[in-house]
C-alpha cells in the first residue's frame, strides 16, 4: 500500500500491523524500526558507532531495519532471515531491498531458528522482528532459542526484539523478559510511543539503562555521527 506522501507499507496477517515502511527520501520514520538502531548503545560508555560491526535480522520482512542499518553503517556485513520468499520478492520490487541500496545484505529464505543454527558467525546486533500477532512463533520464545542467540553474539553483543502488546496487557512482554533473563544478565524495555510495541534489548554484558543516555549524548556531540543515528 502507498499513501499520498510516497510511503509504502507492508501489511501482513489480515492487516493487523505494518511490517515494513519505505519512502524514497526518508530512512527513519520515528517508528518501531528506529529503536533497533539504539540497541548497541546500552553497552557501557563510551560505545561508539565503529564498535557496531555486524548485524543479523530474524524477520527481515521487506528490509526496513536493514535499510536503516545500511544507511548508518554502510560497510558492515548484514544477514537477513525471512521465512516467506514472497515477502523477500516484494522487498526487492517495492522497498529497495537490493544490492544497489544494501550491498552488504545477504538474504536467507528460511525459518529463523533453523537458519540461525546453520550460521557459524557472531554479531554485534541480532534484531528479531518475527513476532507478528496474532501469530507468535513460539519456537522463537524459549530459553533454548535465546541460548542459541547468545552463542551468536560478540562479547559486547545485544539482541533486540519487537514485542506486541496492548496498553493493559503486557503479559507477552513480561514473559519474554523473564525468559531472556535466564540467559542474559540484563534486559531493557523501550515502549514505542503511539504504538502497541515494546522493544526488548538484552545485553551479553551486565548493563544499566543510563548507558543509553550517556552514549546518545556522546553520539550527539560527535560531528562524525550519522544524522539518522543522532536523531534516533
Task: Name every feature range the model reports, one short phrase each.
Residues 4, 27-160, 168-177, 181-183, ...:
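The AdoMet/dcAdoMet-binding core of the Class I SAM-like
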Amino acid at each position: 500500500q502507498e499513501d499520498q506522501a510516497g510511503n509504502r507499507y507492508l501489511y501482513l496477517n489480515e492487516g493487523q500491523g505494518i511490517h515494513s515502511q519505505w519512502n524514497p527520501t526518508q530512512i527513519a520514520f520515528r517508528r518501531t524500526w528506529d529503536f533497533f538502531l539504539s540497541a548497541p548503545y546500552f553497552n557501557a560508555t563510551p560505545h561508539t558507532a565503529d564498535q557496531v560491526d555486524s548485524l543479523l535480522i530474524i524477520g527481515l520482512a521487506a528490509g526496513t531495519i536493514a535499510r536503516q542499518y545500511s544507511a548508518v553503517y554502510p560497510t558492515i556485513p548484514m544477514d537477513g532471515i525471512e521465512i516467506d520468499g514472497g515477502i523477500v520478492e516484494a522487498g526487492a520490487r517495492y522497498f529497495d531491498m537490493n544490492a544497489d541500496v544494501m550491498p552488504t545484505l545477504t538474504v536467507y529464505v528460511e525459518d529463523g531458528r533453523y537458519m540461525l543454527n546453520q550460521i557459524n558467525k557472531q554479531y554485534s546486533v541480532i534484531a528479531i522482528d518475527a513476532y507478528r500477532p496474532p501469530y507468535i512463533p513460539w519456537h522463537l520464545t524459549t530459553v533454548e532459542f535465546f541460548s542459541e542467540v547468545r552463542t551468536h553474539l560478540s562479547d559486547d553483543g545485544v539482541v533486540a526484539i519487537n514485542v506486541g502488546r496492548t496498553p493493559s496487557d503486557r503479559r507477552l512482554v513480561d514473559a519474554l523478559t523473564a525468559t531472556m533473563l535466564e540467559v542474559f544478565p540484563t534486559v531493557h524495555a523501550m515502549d514505542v510511543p503511539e504504538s502497541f510495541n515494546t522493544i526488548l534489548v538484552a545485553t551479553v554484558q551486565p548493563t544499566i539503562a543510563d548507558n543509553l543516555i550517556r552514549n546518545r549524548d556522546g553520539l550527539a556531540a560527535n560531528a562524525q555521527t550519522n544524522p539518522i543515528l543522532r536523531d534516533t
